[in-house]
Curated annotation (Swiss-Prot):
Residues 45-122 form the RRM domain. The gene is Boll. Probable RNA-binding protein, which may be required during spermatogenesis. May act by binding to the 3'-UTR of mRNAs and regulating their translation. PANTHER family: BOULE-RELATED, PROTEIN BOULE-LIKE. This is Protein boule-like.
């Protein structure tokens, strides 16, 4: 009977030693500051202080915490307008002073107001996805006035260190495909001359033509794409001349272009604002001579 009672008491002792702490307040145990926290590294001689009144300045906090140790630095976080956000950081000269404050955090009241005191933790992200380090709801992402980002969650401040991310692999340069590449080139105006195909006439017929002068350099219509159909001259049965018709077929709406220069273009037709029309052909009437004999 004594052996069984001793065995039961031994099992009960082991179970109690393996059971978790009933009141886990912070991911960093207060009595063991050297243990690695879940979200970063503890700053041994620095504490986080929340619940600071907006009227409280850094000198007031320095005087208050100097009662518990040698204060090295006091920093209250302000917004861009210079208004206090209600929390800050106290840095002590030694680690023992900071741990003394953490152990008495539940008893500290400043101006009849309870302060939210916890360890200051520097957050580290080395090759770990950001999503895996996101704390639960109620987390505030903050930045000190000097530009250091940190996270405030459950009364604990987590400092952010610069991320060390892997350099993305350099992709091999792709070769240019053999498919045709269209490169838009500027099109310049070219002096346009009206050309009239020579008409074929029968012998003995007279023909007058209006001399054609080069077109003016005024802005003209740039037709793209266009096509000019040339038809040969036809000879009328009555012995006259029929001028060759000049037809212009447009397949798109012309758009104005006013640049000057000379540029060779393929599959493009340049026409002036007035399309050249063939000169009229005049045929003289035969002269009738009366014979007096």
């Amino acid at each position: 009977m004594e052996t069984e009672s001793r065995a039961q008491s031994t099992n009960q002792t082991q179970t109690d030693s393996l059971s978790p702490s009933p009141n886990p307040v912070s991911p960093v145990p207060l009595n063991n500051p050297t243990s690695g926290p879940r979200y970063g590294t503890v700053i041994p001689n620095r504490i986080f202080v929340g619940g600071i009144d907006f009227k409280t300045n850094e000198n007031d906090l320095r005087k208050f915490f100097s009662q518990y140790g040698s204060v090295k630095e006091v920093k209250i976080v302000n917004d861009r307008a210079g208004v206090s956000k209600g929390y800050g950081f106290i840095t002590f000269e030694t680690q023992e002073d900071a741990q003394k404050i953490l152990q008495e955090a539940e008893k500290l009241n400043y101006k009849d107001k309870k302060l939210n005191i916890g360890p200051a933790i520097r957050k580290q992200q080395v090759g770990i996805p950001r999503s895996s380090l996101m704390p639960a709801a109620g987390t505030m992402y903050l930045t000190t006035s000097t530009g250091y980002p940190y996270t405030y969650h459950n009364g604990v401040a987590y400092f952010h260190t610069p991320e060390v991310t892997s350099v993305p692999p350099s992709w091999p340069s792709r070769s240019i495909s053999s498919s045709p590449v269209m490169v838009a080139q500027p099109v310049y105006q070219q002096p346009a001359y009206h050309y009239q195909a020579p008409a074929q006439c029968l012998p003995g017929q007279w023909q007058w033509g209006v001399p054609q002068s080069p077109a003016s350099s005024a802005p003209f219509l740039y037709l793209q794409p266009s096509e000019v159909i040339y038809q040969p001259v036809e000879i009328a049965q009555d012995g006259g001349c029929v001028p060759p018709p000049l037809s212009l077929m447009e397949t798109s709406v012309p758009e104005p272009y006013s640049d000057h220069g000379v540029q060779a273009a393929y599959h493009q037709v340049y026409a002036s604002s007035a399309i050249a029309m063939p000169a009229p052909m005049m045929q003289p009437e035969p002269i009738k001579v009366r014979s007096l004999f």
